[in-house]
Amino acid sequence: RLEYGVDGTWTIVDYKTGVIPSHNHVRAGVRNQLAVEALIAAEGGFSDLPPGPVAALEYWQISGRGSAPGDIKSRLDGTFDAASKRQYLENLAAEYDNPQCGYPSEPDPSLVPSFKPYEHLSRSREWRSGADYED
């Protein structure tokens, strides 16, 4: 959800039915969805909507076990720095664009959820098991 305030600032909202990303994960760039949307809004990338500063990145809990429905968690410290976020995302894209770059299915095992609905697409079980894997 994109909210453009009367003061000319943006609030970027994600409705969550599951776990809300931690403040540390958002700040460290591990969870980038709202930051990408904020960058687009700040730079005027949404058609027919003006650019402007981002005042808030919020996750609204609408159901789930982690938080009570209705909880709103802000994930922005101070002001949104569009220039540094753009640089971070461009560096990240360049790293993935490098043909010499590997693409691990689980780059940080501490961040892997217990439920992995797309694990079969990464073939990670096959790689862990070696050549004798059969499904």
Indicate where each model-derived feature is located.
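RecB-family 4Fe-4S metal-dependent nuclease core
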Residues: R1-D135
